[in-house]
């Protein structure tokens, strides 16, 4: 019963997020920039991560992050070609790249913890990742 209540609460909260995300996706240009594509996949992976944490299901955490990793390769190619323009502080591209590399390193730690079933470590890394999201968005996103 307790799991059902938690699942219902999580579903309701995520429904609101999904509705906003769906609206953004409708308004996204067809040839969206790779950073935005990666961020949307990361958003989906994070929603799954939170549900997996709440339901104590470490086995469900890893898979969505593989899509994020594949998208990162496209982002890196676009960065190398100079095709990425940051909405804010675009003159600090090296710092953006450094923060991104640190973030993806933490994602690897998250996956390792989930493979071991260490949900305390998953929770700790999740907090660090979320802090990284907020810092990066504050610095580089409008």
Pin down the residues of each PLM region.
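Positively charged n-region of N-terminal signal peptides that target proteins for export
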Residues: 1-4
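Bacterial N-terminal signal peptides
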Residues: 7-16
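Sec/Tat signal peptide C-region and signal peptidase I cleavage site
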Residues: 17-22
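Extracytoplasmic c-type cytochrome modules immediately beyond a signal peptide or single-pass transmembrane anchor
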Residues: 23-128
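The canonical Cys-X-X-Cys-His
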Residues: 129-141
């Amino acid at each position: 019963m307790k799991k059902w209540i938690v699942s219902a609460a999580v579903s309701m909260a995520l429904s609101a997020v999904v509705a906003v995300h769906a609206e953004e996706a409708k308004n996204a240009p067809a040839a969206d920039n790779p950073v935005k594509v990666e961020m949307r996949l990361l958003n989906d992976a994070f929603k799954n991560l939170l549900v997996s944490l709440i339901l104590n299901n470490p086995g469900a955490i890893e898979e969505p992050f593989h899509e994020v990793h594949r998208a990162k390769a496209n982002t890196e190619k676009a960065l190398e070609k100079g095709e990425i323009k940051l909405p804010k502080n675009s003159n600090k591209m090296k710092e953006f790249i450094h923060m991104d590399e640190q973030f993806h390193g933490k994602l690897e730690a998250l996956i390792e913890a989930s493979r071991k079933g260490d949900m305390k470590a998953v929770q700790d890394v999740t907090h660090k990742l979320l802090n990284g999201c907020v810092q990066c968005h504050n610095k580089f996103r409008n």
